[in-house]
Curated annotation (Swiss-Prot):
Gene name as annotated: nreB
Protein name: Oxygen sensor histidine kinase NreB
Record-linked Gene3D superfamilies: 1.20.5.1930, Histidine kinase-like ATPase, C-terminal domain
Domain Histidine kinase residues, every copy: 147-344
Reaction equation(s) it catalyzes: ATP + protein L-histidine = ADP + protein N-phospho-L-histidine
InterPro entries to which the protein is assigned, alphabetical: HATPase_C_sf, His_kinase_dom, Sensor_HK_TwoCompSys, Sig_transdc_His_kin-like_C, Sig_transdc_His_kin_sub3_dim/P, Sig_transdc_His_kinase_NreB
Keyword match Chaperone: no
Pfam families: HATPase_c, HisKA_3
């Protein structure tokens, strides 16, 4: 039952026909286009209007598919009766020669007069959204698999390789003290030094891959371990400020924060030309905010340093996986501020 209005059903339908983005074309039993709304003229030109046969539609059609398979012109929807009163997907070429996907319906609306209606709804935006969601899903799986593999290799290096090398070191020391030979002692001493350096390198590699403290103790412990190692390796001081002492977050959030800050710190090392980097992590219970600040060279976002583009892009991609946002503020000769904001 229609609510009483000043407009009749006929007027309401007329208004819809004239204002909708849906493309509506009426065709008679001879295949002539007898009417179309303004929206349809994005596909069918004025020259096609009213006097043209259905081949006007055919010339714009780039193929269609039903629920089972991709169809060809041989099984044209304008000829088959199987698609009456059903939805299907069709690809049409616009006046600008762009090929766009549409959800279409072709149905007989007046059997006595042989009039059929052909309607098109542009589904390109929905398909784009679906593709983006699919890409994010695949990215999420890829990053998750990468982190799991990093964790596995890191644990293997720490629990197996380093332990075996420590056992070799012990055996080497025993050999040195067991045989009082000057040449052997000097050689053993030199090998011990090389072995010790190799153990340190593998420990650093294990932490770089994925620190066990990130999974066991959380962000703050992982950062303290990483910053200490970073200062020892590169001689750059990191000033760290935080109010999240002992707080734990979702494992995926902690991983994103760690990786984004790690990338920000490493970019500052490579490009900022500074002796100190400031890092902060703060939470108010609703948001988790991490910041990496350097007072160095800065750069133009339009012409970022060579090699940094993928890193900056990767930060944003990772942040999006946890509904976060990365903002980069930079000024030439004034430095760069990278801010990660994640709802929790």
């Amino acid at each position: 039952m229609l609510e009483q209005t000043d407009l009749s059903l006929e007027q309401l339908l007329k208004n819809y026909y004239e204002t909708t983005n849906e493309k509506i074309v009426f065709v008679n039993r001879q295949g002539k286009i007898i009417a179309m709304n303004d929206a349809a003229k994005d596909i069918l030109t004025e020259e096609d209007n009213y006097n043209a046969m259905t081949n006007a539609i055919c010339h714009r059609c780039e193929g269609y598919s039903n629920e089972y398979d991709v169809q060809s012109c041989k099984d044209c929807f304008l000829e088959t009766t199987q698609l009456q009163h059903s939805n299907f997907q069709v690809f049409m070429k616009t006046k600008d020669n762009e090929i766009k996907p549409f959800t279409a319906m072709y149905q007989n609306i007046d059997e006595q007069r042989g009039i059929s209606a052909f309607t098109l709804q542009n589904v390109a935006p929905q398909i784009e959204r679906q593709e983006k969601m699919y890409q994010q899903k695949m990215l999420h799986r890829s990053i998750q698999a990468q982190e799991n593999e990093r964790k596995r290799i890191s644990r293997e290096l720490h629990d197996s390789v380093i332990q075996d090398m420590l056992n070799i070191d012990v055996e080497l020391r025993l050999l040195k003290y067991k045989h009082r030979d000057k040449v052997l002692a000097e050689t053993s001493q030199r090998i011990e030094g090389l072995l010790s350096q190799l153990i340190d390198d593998i420990r650093n590699m294990s932490v770089e891959l994925r620190p066990s403290s990130l999974d066991d103790l959380g962000i703050e412990a992982a950062f303290k371990s990483y910053f200490k190692q970073f200062e020892e390796n590169y001689g750059m001081h990191i000033k760290y400020d935080s109010n999240i002492k002992g707080m734990r977050f979702d494992n995926e959030i902690e991983t994103v924060v760690y990786r984004v800050v790690q990338e920000g710190v490493f970019n500052a090392l490579k490009y900022a030309e500074v002796n100190e980097i400031e890092v902060s992590t703060h939470s108010d219970g609703k948001q988790l905010v991490a910041e990496v600040v350097d007072r160095g060279k800065g750069f133009s976002l339009d012409h970022h340093p060579k090699g940094s583009g993928l890193g900056l892009y990767g930060m944003r991609e990772r942040a999006e996986l946890v509904n976060g946002h990365v903002n980069i503020e930079t000024h030439i000769n004034r430095g760069t501020i990278i801010t990660l904001d994640i709802p929790i």
